[in-house]
Amino acid sequence: MAIFNRDADNLIDFIRPDVTSKYEATNIAKVNTKGFELNTDYRFKLNEFNQTLSFGYNYLNDDILDQNKDLSRYSLNTLKHQFITRFESKLFKNVRQNIIYKHAERTIGTSYNVWDASVIVAVNKFNFTVTANNIFNADYIESGYVPMPPSSLLFGLRYNL
């Protein structure tokens, strides 16, 4: 568990007055951020293989003392709540999987839910990976005002020396 309090004066951010203008670095505001973070893991065995179920929660409360009416790229578009859960499992001697669920809510009230998953198969010195990101094709913004990509499928190969 972590508890924190951050005071920032003359916070530098990239802002713009409207969506057609370019971002400019500017000292924009005095911001006080308070919050806490909780993380826990539950470990167990299934068919003699280790499994892990992880939970994490973050809460942020930004007290924007000098209101910024322009579009801020980072600081004023912060998260208020973030919940992440991960299930890491080993199905067979050489097969592992990860399933991740993330829920986030911004200070302005918008929220999103994202599911990711991956499977790793180890064969001798090789690891073959298949990763699915944003499985249900959620529309969301991670940071700033840049939309995140839709669903994607990635394939990987790693050789271990």
Positions of the model-derived regions?
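Hydrophobic, well-ordered secondary-structure elements that form the walls
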Residues: M1, L38, F87, I99, ...
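Outer-membrane beta-barrel translocator domains and adjoining extracellular loop/strand segments
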Residues: I3, L11-T20, I64-S72, I100-Y101, ...
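Gram-negative outer-membrane beta-barrel transporters
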Residues: F4-A8, N27-A104
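Generic detector of contiguous secondary-structure segments
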Residues: P17-E24, Y42
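Transmembrane beta-barrel architecture of outer membranes
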Residues: Y23, T33, T78-I84, Y112-D116, ...
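Conserved short-loop catalytic and cofactor-binding motifs
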Residues: A25-T26, Y145
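Asparagine-centered polar/low-complexity signal
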Residues: T26-N27, N134
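C-terminal beta-signal and adjacent terminal beta-strands/loops
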Residues: D116-L161
